[in-house]
Swiss-Prot record:
Pathway: Carbohydrate degradation; glycolysis; pyruvate from D-glyceraldehyde 3-phosphate: step 2/5. GO terms for cellular component: cytosol. ATP binds at residues 201, 292, 323, 349-352. GO terms for biological process: gluconeogenesis; glycolytic process. Keywords: ATP-binding, Cytoplasm, Glycolysis, Kinase, Nucleotide-binding, Transferase. It is found in: Cytoplasm. This is Phosphoglycerate kinase. GO terms for molecular function: ADP binding; ATP binding; phosphoglycerate kinase activity. Pfam families: PGK (PF00162). Substrate binds at residues 21-23, 36, 59-62, 118, 151.
Length: 392
């Protein structure tokens, strides 16, 4: 199902009320990573070029429904002004008379930013009275916040009841690439799924299994699968309550003739600590007194091998304890291999995206998803409220 986009509307002289995802990391009031702001620029610049009056809105952090200047979008307005080369006026609120007055005085091509939507608890509650007030700021609702598309909030889904709703370029791109993976990925299709827990990734594994030719399972959750296969995992993370789930998953993979790659060797430590000394174990079995922390060289070679011929690759989640420097090599290497793959490559999920950005590889990836939880739920095959309201 395709979505309606900004290309389907005439914006000349219209007020475009644009939901962006400006939930950026801040340190002492300074933005430490402006990736999400840059991701919104194509949509903003297009709307401006079409003669729209652009009213931007977003949340930032978790102010819990109260005005808290620590979560003000002022730093975002400053950064937008720099990136766009024009003044982006910061408004003191997201609804109310002062906002209405400023918006009514806007000229075509002007850009303003509303204050943090989550200063009102009604935003997350999708309260109808709040939605109505918000809708008075625009003529057309543009949702470009894929990162919050899995939330049925006032500014992500509610507005579609009061204004014509379309997706921005970022939303369109996410829907196109993630949708292609779910609907008709080109074979061979390799899914690399990492992360610490089976419980948080089993829905993605099960959703992608029927479409995959090869599935690589890494990270902390791999040890539960290795335990099912009869290997010793030492003191590594084990989810006992997911043993049966992992077992039936591996059985189903065999029935579907999907090749599942689990770690063949490991980087281990005596304790799960950042300063632990890495030790290499050249076997699938992990010694009883050791904790699995990362994948080893043999596993990496195997992953590299399957990626050479892959036509479609999805990578979600780290292959080891990426946040500990000594145990981040597996994830870093996989980032390199995915970037070198000649097929369509899609990377989603916080740590895998961080790895790609850390090593400046994002330009070599077909699509780096901006949505953490939203990407995950999309890949699980769930209907996302923020996308559903945009469907043609």
């Amino acid at each position: 199902m395709s979505i309606k986009t900004i290309k389907d509307c005439d914006f000349a002289g219209k007020r475009a009320l644009v939901r962006c995802d400006f939930n950026v990391p801040l340190k002492e009031g300074n933005i430490t990573d402006d990736t999400r702001i840059r991701a919104a620029l194509p949509t903003i610049e297009y709307l401006k070029s079409q003669g729209a009056r652009v009213i931007l809105m977003s949340h930032l952090g978790r102010p819990k429904g109260e005005k808290n200047l620590k979560y003000s979008l002022m730093p975002v307005a400053k950064r937008l002004s720099e990136l766009l080369g024009q003044d982006v006026k910061m408004l003191p609120d997201c609804i109310g008379d002062e906002v209405a007055t400023t918006v009514s005085c806007m000229k075509n091509g002007d850009i303003v930013l509303l204050e943090n939507l989550r200063f009102y608890k009604e935003e997350e509650e999708n309260c109808d009275a709040f939605v109505r007030k918000l809708s008075q700021n625009g003529d057309i609702f543009v949702n470009d916040a894929f990162g919050t598309a899995h939330r049925a909030h006032a500014s992500t889904a509610g507005l579609a009841a009061y204004l014509p709703a379309v997706g921005g370029f970022l939303m369109e791109k996410e829907d196109e690439f993630l949708g292609k993976i779910l609907r008709n990925p080109e074979s061979p299709f390799v899914a690399i799924i990492g992360g610490s827990k089976v419980s948080s990734k089993i829905a993605v594994l099960e959703s992608l299994l029927p479409k995959s030719n090869v599935m690589v399972i890494g990270g902390g959750m791999a040890y539960t699968f290795l335990k099912v296969e009869g290997y010793s995992i030492g003191q590594s993370l084990l989810e006992n309550e997911y043993i049966d789930v992992a077992s039936s998953f591996l059985k189903k993979a065999k029935e579907l003739d999907v090749k599942v790659i689990l770690p063949l060797d490991h980087v281990v430590a005596s304790e799960f600590r950042e300063d632990s000394i890495p030790e290499y174990v050249d076997s699938v079995d992990i010694p009883n007194d050791k904790v699995g922390m990362d994948i080893g060289e043999k596993t990496l070679r195997k992953i590299e091998e399957v990626l050479v011929s892959a036509k479609t690759v999805i990578w979600n989640g780290p292959l080891g304890v990426f946040e500990f420097n000594s145990f981040s090599k597996g994830t870093a290497k996989v980032a390199e291999y995915v970037a070198s793959c000649s097929g369509i490559t899609v990377v989603g999920g916080g740590d895998s995206v961080a790895a790609v950005n850390k090593f400046n590889l994002s330009e070599k990836i077909t699509h780096v998803s901006t949505g953490g939880g939203a990407s995950l739920e999309y890949l699980e095959g769930k209907v996302l409220p923020g996308i559903k309201v945009l469907e043609k």
